């Protein structure tokens, strides 16, 4: 007995020593890097059969979660591009919107111009020179290596409005863009650029048709002026795959979605629609500093209200980031902090919680279910929205408070589980189990501005 115990003790000591050595060795090894998700391995982006959402050729849904980096091509160098795109990837974005040209010509941080002979791009690639389009190539390929699409606003609306690109030049420019980028997997074309579609319509049609005649493999939309939608002018165009509206930087309530989003979803032919420029975080409300600034709560409200009302995606924006503001540049629209500091604002950090929620449920088989909210009579500034599928319903309550819900028309199950999701940190909190035979009231854990909540019934 004594011998056996001695052997076991010795063996145990050797085992502990071996485990300790293995642990020491393992901590000295480099950590396994998380594999980058490359969405286009699922095939090209296409419009879903019912015309409401975007998906890949193999059927995998695509949830557009965009970031706004309008002046990245002009203001960031290669190292800064890498830093910015890494932050975008870590924050959960899978798309970044940029202005390919913000002027005619445009100049980038390296002092290189976008064109040297008008819209004749024949000799644009010069040996030994890292030109404007070489830098654009770098941005696109850098984004691709991180699984990020680039939303290419080909030319901003202002120079077109000023007559700096006509129809003939639009055809030449579209041909150049399409031939250069048709084989890149991570391109989404965006015609327009903060402009009404009835302003130089013939130029926008020429640009779109020129690109589409060469590149039939990438989706295309139109980026409109604030508080307008592409559907007003282009919904019947073959080149327009999905609609985009800009709820803009002045509206503060649900009325803008009723006028633009809900109206677009009723148009024929049916096309997906998304808010490509909602309230930017930290931008002065209606561009006037005396009105205060939009904050993380304003951002979350636009995200959840638009997505739960039937949008196919959402683009976040920040006042300092879109312009890549730093002490090298004069601030626009009263920019305050640098673009690098602003990447970590609260609203930007909240985006990934919504993406994880979408990925945890079968979001794109859902639909708006507003009729499930029975009371109270809602005002547009505190408008709760409902969205759900076969196995779940989501309710977004901007100011918390209480709503009366009736699930009897949604499910045959006698009981459902209710949980709260805190959209500020992604925390899931059990609420209660409840019978579905009749309407019931739910009261959020906290109430008031900045105390928005998502209720899940499943």
Each model region followed by its residue ranges:
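Active-site mouth of glycoside hydrolases
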Residues: 35-254
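Aromatic- and carboxylate-lined catalytic core of secreted/periplasmic carbohydrate-active enzymes
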Residues: 60, 272, 281-283, 297-432, ...
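Short beta-strand segments
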Residues: 190-192, 221-224, 244, 274-277, ...
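Residue-level detector of flexible, active-site-proximal loop/helix-junction positions
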Residues: 196, 218, 227, 271-274, ...
């Amino acid at each position: 007995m004594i011998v056996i115990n001695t052997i076991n003790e010795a063996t145990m000591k050797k085992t502990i020593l071996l485990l300790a050595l293995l642990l020491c060795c393992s901590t000295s090894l480099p950590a396994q890097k998380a594999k980058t998700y490359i969405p286009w391995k699922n095939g090209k982006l296409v419009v879903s059969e019912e015309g409401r959402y975007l998906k890949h050729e193999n059927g995998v849904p695509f949830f557009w979660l965009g970031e706004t980096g309008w002046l990245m091509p002009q203001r960031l160098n290669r190292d800064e591009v890498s830093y910015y795109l890494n932050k975008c990837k870590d924050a959960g974005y899978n798309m970044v919107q940029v202005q390919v040209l913000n002027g005619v010509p445009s100049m980038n941080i390296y002092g290189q111009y976008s064109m040297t002979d008008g819209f004749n791009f024949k000799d644009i690639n010069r040996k030994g020179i890292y030109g404007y389009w070489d830098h654009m190539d770098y941005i696109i390929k850098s984004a691709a290596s991180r699984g990020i699409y680039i939303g290419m606003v080909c030319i901003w609306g202002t120079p077109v409005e000023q007559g700096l690109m006509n129809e003939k030049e639009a055809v030449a420019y579209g041909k150049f863009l399409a031939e250069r980028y048709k084989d890149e997997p991570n391109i989404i074309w965006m015609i327009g650029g903060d402009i009404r579609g009835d302003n130089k319509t013939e130029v926008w049609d020429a640009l779109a048709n020129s690109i589409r005649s060469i590149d039939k493999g990438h989706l295309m939309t139109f980026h409109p002026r604030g508080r307008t939608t592409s559907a007003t002018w282009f919904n019947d165009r073959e080149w327009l795959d999905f609609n985009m509206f800009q709820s803009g930087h002045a509206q503060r309530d649900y009325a803008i979605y009723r006028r633009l989003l809900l109206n677009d979803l009723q148009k024929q032919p049916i096309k997906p629609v998304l808010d490509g420029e909602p309230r930017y975080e930290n931008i002065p409300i209606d561009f006037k500093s005396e009105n205060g600034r939009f904050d993380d709560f304003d951002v979350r409200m636009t995200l959840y209200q638009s997505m739960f009302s039937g949008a196919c995606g959402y683009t976040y924006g920040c006042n300092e980031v879109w312009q890549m503001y730093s002490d090298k540049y004069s601030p626009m629209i009263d920019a305050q902090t640098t673009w690098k500091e602003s990447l970590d604002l609260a609203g930007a950090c909240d985006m990934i919680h919504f993406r994880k929620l979408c990925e945890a449920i079968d979001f794109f088989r859902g639909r708006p279910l507003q009729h499930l909210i029975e009371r109270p009579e809602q005002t547009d500034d505190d408008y709760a929205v409902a969205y759900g599928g076969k196995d779940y319903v989501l309710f977004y309550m901007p100011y918390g408070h209480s709503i009366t819900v009736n699930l009897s028309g949604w499910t045959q199950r006698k009981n459902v589980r209710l949980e709260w999701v805190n959209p500020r940190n992604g925390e899931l909190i059990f609420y209660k189990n409840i019978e579905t035979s009749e309407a019931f009231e739910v009261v959020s854990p906290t109430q008031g501005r900045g105390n928005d909540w998502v209720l899940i019934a499943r």
